[in-house]
């Protein structure tokens, strides 16, 4: 049985590339015991000095909703009753991330015409850490790393990500965070397109992991190359 995370990944594949993308993924999964290759694009962007909403002629998205910034287990406990158990990372996992210094942004929208809130999605960020394909390392750059994002299926495509992004950017400005970064699978076309166009990220490198004969032989992109790509991006954006 597929895990919730795999089901979500298949849904993203279908949205971005249709049935051929799903079939390609399935073939690779069948061949994975012999040869398995994973890749993640490394994406990053510099935080603008001011919100796009401050620009002349730019109005706030009309989607009705709110985004809460959660930095402690106590803050999570206050709203956990509205979070469904079906999300990819359950409450216990979210608490562990908070204990590690992560920040979680929760998106809600009004329930029908009443005043109750209903859960839309969440994203997990962490400062000064970079993680890709099972490896993780602290970095000396002033970056906010996006660990994971999930929007419930019934709310996708309704611009709730705009509410989340605005809240996240305001948090970064208040806390002196200069850069955002994350990773996206190359075959996740819908997320990649959104990141590069709507969110104005740049692809600054690609991390690869190749496993042969059930992990007997493994090659991974060296950390030095990943750090160099991040450092070059920071240097160029700082000069600019």
Annotated model-derived regions:
Residues 186-207:
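Conserved active-site alpha-helix within GNAT-family acetyltransferase domains
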Residues 214-240:
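Charge-rich, low-complexity intrinsically disordered segments
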Residues 148-151, 157-170:
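Conserved acetyl-CoA-binding loop-helix of GNAT-fold acetyltransferases
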Residues 81-153:
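A conserved beta-strand-loop-helix scaffold within acyl/acetyltransferase catalytic domains
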Residues 1-74, 80-81, 89-92:
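Acyl-donor-binding surface of acyltransferase catalytic domains
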Residues 172-184:
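Conserved GNAT acetyl-CoA-binding A-motif
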Residues 147-149, 182-185:
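Short His-Asn-centered micro-motif
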Residues 25, 41-42, 201-217:
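Conserved catalytic-core motifs of GNAT/GCN5-like acyltransferases
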């Amino acid at each position: 049985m597929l895990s919730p995370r795999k089901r979500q990944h298949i849904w993203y594949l279908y949205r971005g590339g249709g049935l051929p993308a799903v079939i390609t993924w399935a073939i690779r999964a069948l061949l994975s015991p012999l040869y398995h290759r994973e890749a993640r694009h490394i994406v990053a962007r510099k935080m603008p000095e001011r919100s796009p909403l401050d620009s002349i002629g730019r109005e706030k998205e009309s989607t009705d909703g709110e985004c809460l910034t959660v930095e402690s287990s106590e803050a999570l406990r206050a709203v956990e009753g509205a979070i469904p158990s079906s999300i990819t990372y359950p409450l216990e996992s979210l608490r562990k991330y908070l204990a590690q210094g992560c920040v979680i942004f929760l998106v809600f929208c009004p329930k029908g015409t009443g005043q109750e809130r209903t859960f839309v999605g969440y994203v997990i960020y962490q400062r000064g850490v970079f993680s890709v394909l099972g490896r993780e390392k602290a970095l000396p750059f002033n970056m906010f790393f996006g660990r994971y994002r999930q929007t419930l299926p019934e709310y996708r495509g309704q611009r709730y990500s705009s509410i989340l992004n605005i809240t996240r950017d305001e948090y970064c400005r208040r806390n002196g965070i200069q850069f955002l970064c994350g990773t996206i699978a190359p075959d996740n076309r819908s997320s990649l397109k959104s990141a590069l166009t709507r969110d104005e990220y740049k692809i600054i490198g690609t991390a690869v992991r190749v496993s042969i004969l059930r992990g007997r032989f493994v090659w991974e992109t060296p950390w030095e190359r990943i750090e160099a790509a991040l450092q070059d991006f920071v240097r160029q954006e700082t000069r600019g």
